[in-house]
């Protein structure tokens, strides 16, 4: 595939994209950060993206026509981009990382005082090379290698965890739990699974009887976490308090959904906090608080999904917007020194120096522009180039038609 072909394919696909969404992005970001500072937030303003960047800075970029793989194979290292597809129909991948699944959120009214953001997932099917709807599951996380996923059934919190064979679409084993689960996360090696426990649906939103008084102050129902061995299904549960005044005088808050995850080395558990004084805490497997590991974990930003780079030398940071209109910080894990990389929200590392990110299209900044008009791109430390990987999102809120959220895994 030569540059002319790539450019022609990209222009053709982009011509079929959805029209820009309406304004209101800045207000939405402020509201989301104030309410829950969720991982789905899409940060501020514009990306200057040249179409010719499609052919720059990646090992090999496939057009939609040539991205067909044999059954059971997901090539490591190759870049698979579909700039005209949103949501994607065919595999999106770069370097070590692939879009293993995505979900579309829908707001469902439970009562006059409560609504729930429900997810409908599409999982990558190796046999067809496409994403296939999987309506049974309310939560899906995919293990490294993209052969197994951990799933929860529709009603949250759930009393059992399924281990789904992604080749067959069948659950290989159910893990029964006595504390109901609302969130799941694999360790980096795929051998452990952290399950966050809740007493109420963590995706619920509560509304005041009087809309003029603001949102009611409803505490999180999070109770703790399981650390489970994936091979045996065995593990232990630890209770963790949900926040408030600490013995050291600092105050912590917990979002209604605030899931736990394992640290890079798999020795500890951590979770973020939407607090100015304490933004994350680390625990041993008994739930006792411990210091941050000496691997750069102290620089982790809990709502930035990319985390530590594969070689451990960098940590993906929050929105920057200094060198470019839309950019994010990358932090040296040894020194804490910050530099910038293109992209408004860093989602996953493709290799030691490249990341998959959300970023806005060219011309989408300024008054009256559509700051929600974001797509997946590949960015690289030290480069001002971006490679479009997906088409643009539609809609103007996190539950609008045309919005979808990615689920990445190491392939």
State where each predicted segment sits:
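N-terminal export/targeting signals for secretion/compartment entry
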Residues: 1-77
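Non-cleavable N-terminal signal-anchor transmembrane helices
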Residues: 52-150
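Surface-exposed loop/turn elements that mediate protein-protein interactions on large endomembrane-trafficking
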Residues: 75-83, 110-136, 158-177, 223-244, ...
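Blade-terminus and WD-like Trp-Asp/Gly-His loop motifs, strongest in beta-propeller folds
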Residues: 89-96, 139-149, 184-193, 259-268, ...
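Short, conserved, GDST-rich strand-edge loop motifs in beta-rich repeat architectures
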Residues: 93-114, 196-220, 361-370
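Recurrent small/Gly-Pro-centered beta-turn motifs in extracellular repeat architectures
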Residues: 102-105, 153, 197, 272-273, ...
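Non-cytosolic head/periplasmic domains of membrane-anchored proteins
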Residues: 137-212, 216-227, 232
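Acidic, serine/threonine- and glycine-rich low-complexity intrinsically disordered segments
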Residues: 189-323
């Amino acid at each position: 595939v030569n540059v002319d072909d790539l450019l022609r394919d990209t222009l053709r696909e982009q011509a079929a994209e959805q029209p820009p969404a309406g304004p209101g992005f800045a207000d939405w970001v402020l509201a989301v950060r104030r309410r829950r500072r969720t991982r789905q937030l899409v940060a501020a303003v514009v990306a200057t993206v040249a179409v010719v960047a499609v052919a720059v800075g990646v090992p090999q970029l496939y057009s939609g026509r040539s991205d067909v793989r044999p059954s059971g194979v997901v090539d490591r290292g190759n870049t698979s981009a579909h700039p005209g597809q949103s949501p994607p129909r065919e595999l999106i991948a770069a370097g070590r990382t692939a879009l293993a699944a995505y979900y579309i959120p829908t707001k469902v009214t439970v009562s006059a005082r409560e609504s729930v953001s429900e997810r409908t997932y599409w999982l990558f099917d190796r046999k067809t090379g496409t994403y296939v709807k999987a309506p049974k599951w309310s939560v899906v996380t995919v293990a490294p290698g993209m052969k197994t996923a951990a799933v929860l059934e529709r009603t949250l919190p759930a009393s059992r965890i399924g281990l789904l064979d992604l080749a067959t679409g069948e659950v290989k084993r159910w893990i029964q739990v006595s504390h109901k689960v609302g969130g799941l996360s694999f360790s980096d090696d795929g051998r452990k699974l952290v399950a966050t426990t809740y007493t109420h649906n963590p995706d619920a939103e509560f509304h005041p009887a009087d809309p003029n008084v603001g949102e009611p102050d409803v505490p999180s129902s999070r109770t703790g976490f399981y650390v489970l061995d994936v091979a045996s299904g065995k593990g232990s549960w630890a209770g963790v308090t949900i926040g408030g005044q600490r013995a050291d005088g600092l105050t912590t808050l917990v979002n209604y959904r605030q899931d736990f995850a394992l640290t890079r080395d798999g020795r500890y558990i951590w979770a973020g906090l939407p607090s100015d004084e304490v933004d994350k805490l680390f625990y041993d497997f008994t739930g006792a608080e411990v210091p941050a590991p000496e691997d750069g974990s102290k620089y982790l930003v809990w709502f930035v999904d990319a985390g530590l780079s594969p070689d451990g030398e960098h940590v993906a940071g929050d929105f920057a917007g200094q060198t470019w209109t839309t950019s994010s910080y990358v932090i040296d894990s040894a020194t804490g020194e910050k530099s910038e990389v293109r992209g408004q929200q860093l989602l996953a590392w493709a290799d030691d120096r490249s990341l998959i990110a959300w970023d806005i299209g060219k011309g989408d900044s300024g008054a009256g522009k559509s700051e929600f008009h974001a797509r997946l791109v590949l960015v690289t430390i030290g480069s001002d180039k971006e490679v479009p990987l997906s088409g643009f999102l539609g809609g103007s809120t996190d539950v609008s038609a045309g919005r979808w959220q990615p689920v990445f895994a190491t392939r």
